[in-house]
């Protein structure tokens, strides 16, 4: 029986912060990896005059291409980029995923961040875990789920890493190629920056 691992991200390209680990776990027989995005990144091209609907379609397609290259499917909670607020509907939708396929581990964004959607993302993940576990007298009934946070050097505040994931040159090249698929968000530039920060 496979163990379920969830990567819960605010936007389609936020997976880049933990791409190496996602790549590795997606090749492990014992794990089924789930990529869940809170929003479709609808406002990611607003400075270029692209409508939210068109932007969502572009970014959804890019995320599906990246996930598809790893043999994964992306799932969506349908909050709106820039307006995500950990709605009960989003938390319950993720909780329903957790109930159907209980998580062994959850990787999500560090909750102290300059981007509000990043902050909300971890709240949704933790609320969904709480909803799926059930609560008695304010205490979660059972939780055997590991929760890990990832961060961005430019956005996250006060994050001190405690775990590192080693990658060889071949894995870095694959990671670079995957990140480059996020073309509308300057994927090649992000991949170069990520390589420098790694």
Language-model region placement:
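Glycine-rich phosphate-binding loop and adjoining beta1-alpha1-beta2 segment
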Residues: 41-73
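Metal-dependent de-N-acetylase/amidase catalytic core
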Residues: 1-8, 28, 32, 54, ...
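ATP-dependent adenylation/pyrophosphate-handling site
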Residues: 3-52
